[in-house]
């Protein structure tokens, strides 16, 4: 068997096995980790979008909290600052302004500066183009203005 076929089979086996690794922890443990991630980023508060989702789409909310937050966001290897900058860049690049805004808010909450977020937008021009970066800049400008007004 050729090496690339073996590599392909191994990749397929690992891809199937990966979701089962998350099952080693109970859903309750994963949800607790997810809740802890959100609260660590959101000044000890829950996330309003996630809380609204619980009302109408409980399965989606639980999956988001257990998998995205409890399994992925709580992994070692990257600090919260790096994760948030990556999330802002990714959401800006795909044009998901609402999610980008949430993660930019988290980034500001944990000490990322407005200037650093602006640099992320500048970087987005390279892989995603100016229209996506301009849209992201508008969203960040709104967020910055709201946060400045809310300060005493």
Task: Describe the residue ranges of each PLM region.
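Bacterial N-terminal signal peptides that target proteins for export
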Residues: 1-10
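Bacterial N-terminal signal peptides
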Residues: 9-19
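Acidic, glycine/proline-rich low-complexity segments that act as flexible tails and inter-domain linkers
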Residues: 22-81, 109, 133-152
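Short acidic alpha-helix initiation/capping motifs at coil-to-helix transition points
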Residues: 62-65, 94-100
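Short, structured motif recognition centered on aromatic/hydrophobic residues
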Residues: 83-91, 120-121
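Alpha-helical transition-metal enzyme core signature, strongest for iron centers
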Residues: 93, 127-130
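Extended intrinsically disordered, low-complexity coil regions enriched in Ser, Thr, Gly, Ala
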Residues: 96-118, 134-144
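Substrate/cofactor-recognition hotspot
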Residues: 123, 130-134
């Amino acid at each position: 068997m050729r090496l690339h076929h073996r590599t392909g089979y191994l990749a397929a086996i690992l891809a199937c096995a990966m979701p089962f690794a998350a099952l080693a922890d109970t859903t309750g443990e994963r949800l607790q980790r997810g809740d802890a991630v959100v609260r660590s980023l959101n000044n000890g508060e829950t996330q309003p979008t996630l809380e609204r989702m619980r009302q109408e789409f409980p399965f989606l909310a639980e999956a988001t909290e257990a998998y995205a937050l409890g399994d992925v966001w709580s992994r070692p290897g990257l600090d919260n600052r790096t994760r948030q900058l990556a999330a802002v860049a990714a959401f800006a690049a795909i044009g998901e302004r609402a999610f980008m805004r949430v993660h930019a808010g988290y980034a500001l909450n944990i000490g990322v500066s407005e200037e650093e977020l602006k640099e992320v937008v500048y970087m987005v021009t390279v892989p995603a183009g100016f229209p996506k970066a301009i849209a992201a800049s508008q969203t960040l400008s709104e967020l910055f203005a709201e946060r400045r007004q809310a300060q005493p």
